């Protein structure tokens, strides 16, 4: 869910990197270490939910053959296949961006709050975060969704439905 402008990400200088993405480090960054060992990498483990891509550079770098070879060679280690393959092949060509701004995992509100010593509260998130990522199995469009950010999703869904309804009425009036 996009709640603030993406332009600063769009205008980011990649400084020679091909991609920019956020790593969901959690409270202790333990997952990074586990993923580095599991995938034999030395960089942060990047989430593939939101990425900035230098398309010209990526077209020269990314090949289907490399992706299929990676899947074949690492099929036993792949837990989140898209992210795992991305990290194995292109993680070293990725610029880290702040997950709290560009790929906020809504399941981890408490962790963000603790990690920031209380700074990244709900008001801060609403003013500063650009992308809320509804990671995991449970989604805000499901009736039993219980996350704090679910109401925000429903609010934007309601606004969208109103706009679509108004547009439809205007189009019918013109005909």
Regions of interest found by a model, annotated:
Residues 3-8, 30-35, 61-66, 144:
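A short secondary-structure junction signal
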Residues 35-41, 116-121:
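Short, P/G- and charge-enriched loop/turn segments at secondary-structure junctions
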Residues 47-175:
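A glycosyltransferase accessory/donor-loop signature
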Residues 10-11, 42-43, 122-123:
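Short secondary-structure boundary/capping segments
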């Amino acid at each position: 869910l996009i709640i603030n402008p993406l332009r600063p990400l769009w205008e980011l200088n990649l400084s020679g990197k091909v991609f920019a993405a956020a790593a969901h480090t959690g409270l202790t960054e333990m997952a990074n270490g586990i993923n580095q060992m599991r995938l034999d990498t030395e960089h942060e483990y990047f989430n593939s939910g939101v990425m900035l891509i230098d398309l010209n550079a990526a077209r020269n770098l990314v090949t289907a053959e490399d992706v299929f070879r990676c899947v074949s060679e690492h099929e036993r280690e792949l837990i989140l296949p898209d992210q795992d393959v991305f990290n194995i092949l292109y993680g070293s060509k990725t610029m880290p961006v702040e997950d709290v701004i560009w790929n906020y995992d809504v399941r981890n509100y408490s962790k963000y709050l603790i990690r920031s010593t209380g700074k990244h509260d709900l008001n801060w998130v609403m003013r500063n975060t650009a992308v809320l990522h509804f990671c995991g199995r449970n989604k805000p469009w499901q009736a039993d969704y219980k996350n704090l950010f679910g109401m925000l999703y429903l609010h934007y869904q309601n606004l969208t439905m109103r706009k679509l309804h108004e547009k439809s009425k205007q189009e019918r009036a013109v005909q």
